[in-house]
């Protein structure tokens, strides 16, 4: 029976990491959305701890993805930083607001969003080009980044999930980013928001189960790297489809895990 005990967490974390890594590398999606429900459901872990572990897996996976996107010139650092500042600031406001409202999990909502967003990318790919992106004046773009950052931050803090999905949605639809740049910028911002989140979770909730923590971090990192490299080589249309498929599968999988 004992071998089972070691093997089981490895399997759970492998699939959680795979889902999270692909989600991060392809869509700039937060690992928290995938890893937390799996750890809670299969390993019976405390939800607060699970989110902490998921967020720390996010940090490295996002950093590696961001680096890969940056090398391929698919990262808007300037606006990313502007947006990040407003995201971080308003995440605090958001989580304060959330503490005033009776705690309900907004989990189902973000999963549903993931699913819908996936369908959107398959049905209606984002085909903006880099050239079209350059057409917007720097000042307008900076203001847009701040406003969107505020919105994302509030949602992040309130829902308590890395606003990876929100960010991708807002970057592609509101700011008119090209998909690769949107994902690159989204992961870049997420590296920092996840770091802040993970640190605060561990400060409040104590240290995690290091085995599970380590496995999650490593597996997520591995898959995020694979996905990011692939994403940067792919043609926009293929990438949209791949991203969409990954999101839909993840959405369905998480819903399945939650309600079974």
What spans do the regions from the language model cover?
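Juxtamembrane transmembrane-helix boundary motif
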Residues: 1-22, 36-42, 47, 68-154, ...
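Hydrophobic, membrane-facing alpha-helical anchors
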Residues: 3-9, 13, 56-67, 162-171
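Transmembrane helix-bundle signature of multi-pass membrane transporters/permeases
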Residues: 21, 51-59, 183-194, 247
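Transmembrane helix boundary and interhelical junction motifs in multipass membrane proteins
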Residues: 26-35, 160-170
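Membrane-interface alpha-helices at helix entry/exit sites of multi-pass transporters
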Residues: 45-53, 78-79, 176-187
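A small-residue-rich subset of transmembrane alpha-helices
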Residues: 57, 185-201, 211-224
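Short, structured loop/turn "capping" segments at alpha-beta junctions
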Residues: 129-130, 161-166, 177-181
